[in-house]
Amino acid sequence: MKISHFFACLDRLRLIQRWSLMRNIEKENLAEHSLQVAFVAHALAVIKNKFYQGHLNPDRIAVMAMYHDTSEIFTGDLPTPIKYFNPKITQAYKEIENAAEAHLLALLPKELQADFAPYLDSTQFSAQEKHVVKQADLICAYVKAQFELENGNQEFKAAKARLETLMKTWHSDEMRYFIEVFIPSFGKPIDEITL
């Protein structure tokens, strides 16, 4: 059998630091972020189905979210101000991300590629699935910014304001539900959230 480097590459997610241009009270790596996004994306899909006439597959969305930033194994975590500096850079970076996704998928044994492609190849995601994963990504970034600010790190003030604006753009009923029901618990002491 031929050796595959796929999971060794995924293991590198824990080495990629997010928010790399900002001082962090608590560092966050891409593996941690991806798991949190998967939790939130799954919840958003369940909430949409339960309360807002959705027809999403929460399990599929959770796995998509687990893999949503895996292209950064090859590209690194490009800071947002650079990624969205102008439309040409944004488009070029999207092409790089697509090439990185294809390369990662090609690291799998050929017999497994078709089974993983629906979660790794963003061209196979529906607009609604992408929307839910993006919402989860924004919520998790917002939670991080809020944590940093609550712990005295003013470096995240502009990031939180930018995220609040983006969250309004990506808003949905399920996102509002999640924010109202779950976000207030973040930052509370362990004794308050476990009793």
Swiss-Prot record:
Stated family: Belongs to the 5DNU family.
Q: What is its main location?
A: cytoplasm
- What keywords tag this UniProt record? Cytoplasm, Hydrolase, Metal-binding, Nucleotide-binding
Q: Which GO terms describe its cellular component?
A: cytoplasm
PANTHER family in the cross-refs: 5'-DEOXYNUCLEOTIDASE HDDC2
What is said about its interaction partners and assembly? Answer: Homodimer.
Question: What EC designation does it have?
Answer: 3.1.3.89
Q: What class of enzyme is it?
A: hydrolase
What does the record give as the function of this protein?
Answer: Catalyzes the strictly specific dephosphorylation of 2'-deoxyribonucleoside 5'-monophosphates.
The residues annotated as site (Appears to be important in orienting the phosphate for catalysis) are R18
HD domain segment(s)? 30-142
- Record-linked NCBIfam families: PRK03826.1 (NF003009)
Q: Which Gene3D superfamilies match?
A: Hypothetical protein af1432
* Intracellular or extracellular location(s): Cytoplasm
Question: Which SMART domains does the annotation name?
Answer: HDc
Q: Which residues bind a divalent metal cation?
A: H33, H68, D69, D137
Q: Which cysteines are joined by disulfide bonds?
A: none
Name of the protein this chain belongs to: 5'-deoxynucleotidase PM0747
Q: List positions binding substrate.
A: R18, W19, H33, D69, D77, L78, P79, T80, D137
Question: What catalytic activity does the UniProt entry give for this protein?
Answer: a 2'-deoxyribonucleoside 5'-phosphate + H2O = a 2'-deoxyribonucleoside + phosphate
